[in-house]
């Protein structure tokens, strides 16, 4: 899929701090995993209307629609760039290992990325003041059994599981 929104995804997939927060293997780089993660961030944080437990189809349709939308509303490019950058800086400040499971982790599990990235964005959307806060309390739940359960790969693409993991992070960040 080529178009102005896809160009933005490719651009953002190469930026810091994202590439440092979300390490992927050489194979993952070759398979454009960073672009996949950026695309999932936007697709899932924009809402899951039309999602039917088939991420590839949902994401394809999302990017196709956004390419058309950005072509007629080019100002959206900067809005989406800011949204992504803001979220990555927030994750860098709030989550000690970024999207990794541990400090020395060399991989970014998709379910973990979705939970943290999308959950953070949803929390920021509800309470923009989070961007100015210093959050020190994530380690307690980040390393807990509940977070491990919601980010497990079992049925990870089911919409209920996707909502559960993104909602888990959103609610913890909002103190719900």
Locate predicted features.
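Solvent-exposed functional surfaces
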Residues: 1-149
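Acidic, carboxylate-rich catalytic segments that either coordinate divalent cations
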Residues: 137-176
């Amino acid at each position: 899929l080529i178009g102005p929104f896809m160009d933005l995804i490719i651009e953002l997939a190469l930026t810091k701090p994202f590439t440092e927060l979300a390490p992927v293997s050489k194979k993952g780089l070759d398979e454009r995993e960073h672009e996949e993660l950026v695309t999932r961030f936007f697709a899932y944080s924009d809402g899951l209307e039309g999602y039917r437990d088939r991420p590839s189809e949902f994401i394809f349709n999302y990017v196709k629609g956004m390419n058309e939308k950005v072509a007629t509303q080019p100002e959206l490019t900067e809005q989406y760039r800011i949204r992504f950058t803001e979220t990555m800086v927030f994750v860098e400040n709030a989550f000690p290992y970024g999207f990794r499971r541990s400090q020395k982790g060399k991989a970014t599990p998709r379910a973990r990325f979705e939970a943290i990235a999308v959950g953070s964005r949803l929390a920021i959307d509800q309470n923009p003041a989070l961007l100015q806060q210093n959050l020190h309390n994530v380690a307690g739940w980040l390393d807990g059994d509940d977070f491990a359960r919601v980010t497990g790969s079992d049925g990870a693409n089911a919409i209920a599981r996707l909502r559960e993991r993104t909602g888990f992070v959103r609610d913890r960040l909002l103190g719900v």
